[in-house]
Amino acid sequence: MGKRAAAIALMTALVSGAALAADRPGQTFLLKPSDLPKPYATPPVANRNEVIPRPGNAMPQAPRGFKVTIFATGLTIARFMAVAPNGDVFLSERLPNKITLLRDSRNIGVADQRFTFADGLRNPSGVAVHKGYVYISDQNAIWRTPYVPGATKAGKLERVTKARDLRLTAMHGTRNFAFGADGALMLEIGSRDNVSDFRPGAEIFKVVKGELLPFASGLRNPVGIVFQPGTNNLYVSVNERDGLGDALAPDFFTLVKPGGFYGYPWSYTGKNPDPDMGAARPDMVAKSITPDVLFPAHSAPTGTLFYTGDNFPAEYKGDAFVSLHGSWNTSKPTGYKVVRIRFKDGRPVGGHENFLTGFWDGRANPFKVWGRPVGLAVYRDGSLLVADDASNTIWKVTYQKQERSL
């Protein structure tokens, strides 16, 4: 091996090792708007991963004291989940266009039964159990059917939204929704393009008597949408735009204010003008709200929830979890993990920390990925369920009570 080849190999190993080290459970990150480079500080790249079968007995890594097990596997593009009062788990599976019901009939922490609860959908995403109904969203509508404990097949689906369909945009197809403490139903619709001012899209709507009423805008692809428990405080995790370099624009998690504008397409991360769009609407740049928590650009946040269970240590109660589905267009891979956002006095403290990692190996080129976390749910025993649409597995993360030594 020549000196140049040896140097390249050493640098590759160092970069890969750093990437893996940056994925340790418990490691904390604080990205500030003042830390951001100028647009095009690095060239835009396409750096797609190679998805591989899960190697041997590889498992996601969680902080000390937590145990990771398999709740269900052999799924097909496992996306988002909801846990019913009786412990059944409703899961959206994208390509089969169906909602699957998973049941742990023996109460051993493994789904030993599965049923097709609803099919014939179009790219289903969101699912929830709310006030006697199972709600499902796809690109046609939000639907609902009566929740019958123990039933394994949905009754007739009733359309909740009146729009002809919810496809509306071609680029971002997820249609997640959330219910507030007052019963308000919110729906997210992502943008049609990477960067454009096409509407509707890049918005959150309030669903009132089936009509979609604008609630907040400037949110390019707000996949993760959730109310803080017991409140009407709506939080969202957003996939920002591509093409500005490795570090731009940061994805984010933030409180959504009624009528709030969060930048897209005119600006990013507050009042940073988009290099192609910003000059046309300085008024919109000036009114853009800076988000609460920033993630590295291209991390692709998806599933988002607040922890409400009793299994985890008390300090986790009320904190948020966000799954980062992972990058495709940055020279250094980012995401592929679940992160925790600590809250204090009802508000996020600013940063985030690794919670569930180990889904990829940066030592190969192209880098190899065997897991991509998406949906999150709190199971009936207080454990955290994580849907993974690469290994098509639902992971179960349980805290093992530590006995005090004598």
For the regions a protein language model found, what residue spans apply to each?
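Hydrophobic core register within WD40 beta-propeller blades
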Residues: 81, 127, 177, 222-225, ...
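Structural WD40 beta-propeller signal
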Residues: 74, 84, 130, 178-180, ...
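Short loop/turn segments immediately following the C-termini of beta-strands
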Residues: 93-94, 139-141, 147, 190-192, ...
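Asp-box/WD-like beta-propeller blade repeats and closely related beta-sheet repeat scaffolds
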Residues: 114, 123, 128-130, 140-180, ...
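Beta-propeller domain segments
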Residues: 22-63, 174, 191-194, 202, ...
